[in-house]
Amino acid sequence: SAYARSYFIERPSLGAASARAGNVIGGGDWAVDRIIPDCVRAIESDKSIELRNPSATRPWQHVLEPISGYLLLAASLRKDPLAFVGSWNFGPTSKEVRTVLEVAEHLIARFDRGRINCESSAKIPHEAGLLQLNCDRANQILGWYPRWDFESTLDMTADWYKKVDGGEEANKVTKGQ
């Protein structure tokens, strides 16, 4: 990239790369207007899960997946800085890209309770219907692939919230995953 050529060309022992992840989910996210924490809050308070765009698809992945890719990239840059310079995407395979509705339905099944309400309002902000990442470079050059499929990702996410809500320490639950 131009940035790397501008600042790192005279230091061949130092490689620069940028990394991007798909839609990261997992335990510990309590932000507002994010699908997982919004679903968990609705389920736990016996309210409907409000979905703004149920048919939108996203490259969902557990937070630990891109972290493993980032660490592999960092180790590769350390071994051979110039060979791994550039942009990298870390995300699920295209067959694991699913809809917002499928995420909510899976969480309801894992919690054994909950209901969905699909909003239809003019106030809903525009969101892209389909998001995908091309992770071929990470797959082919680094040999990185996600370990968990869509179902496993959501199972681990639901388990994290259930265990922490049940009194287990968040740090221990995360390390156990």
Show where each model-derived region lies:
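Active-site Tyr-X1-5-Lys
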Residues: 1-17, 40-45
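A generic local structural motif
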Residues: 3, 36-37, 116-118
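Flexible, glycine-rich beta-alpha linker
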Residues: 9-35, 57, 89
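C-terminal substrate-binding subdomain of Rossmann-fold SDR/epimerase-dehydratase oxidoreductases
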Residues: 23, 43-177
